[in-house]
A protein has these predicted regions:
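General nucleic-acid-binding
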Residues: 1-42
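Short, Lys/Arg-enriched anionic-surface-contact patches
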Residues: 48-67
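Short, amphipathic alpha-helical "recognition" segments used to contact nucleic acids or chromatin
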Residues: 64-79
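Short, solvent-exposed alpha-helical "recognition" segments
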Residues: 99-113
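Intrinsically disordered, low-complexity basic tails/linkers immediately adjacent to helix-turn-helix/homeobox/MYB/SANT
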Residues: 112-124
Length: 124
């Protein structure tokens, strides 16, 4: 991005009361909780889709969709990891990573997540 474009972007798009100069040599957002807070605030303003479009590339958004489907399928327990891999067009190692993450969760969390995903499936 050219300096001229960046300057124009800052002047034209960001209100003066929001822009600030920082002399700190470290990033402003350093923890996962900071990102979660951003998402919550964007969602409250109904701008979460815009935030995700800016933060994630198309491929990253597709990977997130795949991860949601992986977790959903694993929690359903109706298909083998190999079948899930074939269904979603992802590698078995990707399914295994999702399975390993689920193993770190307690039963209440898994039950909540299974219910949450089942109740929030898009209408088809």
């Amino acid at each position: 991005m050219s300096d001229d474009y960046q300057g124009t972007l800052q002047q034209d798009k960001i209100p003066d009361e929001i822009t600030m100069t920082t002399t700190n040599d470290s990033p402003d957002f350093t923890e996962w909780q900071n990102v979660l807070d951003l998402i919550r605030h964007a969602s409250a303003e109904q701008r979460d889709e815009l935030l995700f479009q800016v933060l994630l590339t198309h491929d990253e958004r597709e990977a997130l969709i795949a991860r949601v489907n992986i977790v959903h399928e694993l929690l359903n327990g109706e298909r083998s990891q190999r079948k899930i891999s074939e269904l979603l067009g992802v590698g078995v190692a990707t399914i295994t990573r999702g399975s390993n993450e689920l193993k770190h969760q307690d039963d209440d969390t898994k039950a909540w997540l299974a219910n949450f995903l089942a109740q929030n499936k898009p209408n088809q």
